[in-house]
């Protein structure tokens, strides 16, 4: 089990999502995704989980639902899951 660490960008983005009136079902999907990652389990193919390229190559990205993306990093040596940011493709890139 990984310890979860949230970056400031992630905290700001998740608050923005909450203010936008996020549906309970989507909130649960976000929590389930984070729980799966923290448990060390592989995400199902539907999440389109992949490593990013270029300057962001040390991070991974998964599609939580539609255009809602989660950028994260797993530090296996220290057993830490870092939640980097969350949002739409246009918000993140």
Show where each model-derived region lies:
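Basic, Lys/Arg-enriched alpha-helical interface segments
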Residues: 1-66, 75-81, 90-93
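Catalytic Cys-His active-site segments of thiol-dependent hydrolases/isopeptidases
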Residues: 83-85
């Amino acid at each position: 089990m990984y310890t979860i660490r949230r970056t400031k960008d992630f905290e700001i983005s998740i608050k923005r999502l909450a203010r936008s009136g996020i549906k309970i079902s989507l909130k649960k999907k976000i929590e389930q995704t984070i729980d799966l990652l923290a448990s060390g389990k592989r995400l199902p193919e539907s999440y389109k989980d992949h490593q990013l390229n270029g300057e962001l190559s040390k991070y991974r990205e998964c599609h939580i639902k539609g255009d809602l993306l989660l950028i994260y990093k797993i530090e296996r040596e220290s057993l830490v899951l870092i939640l980097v940011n969350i949002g739409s493709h246009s918000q993140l890139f």
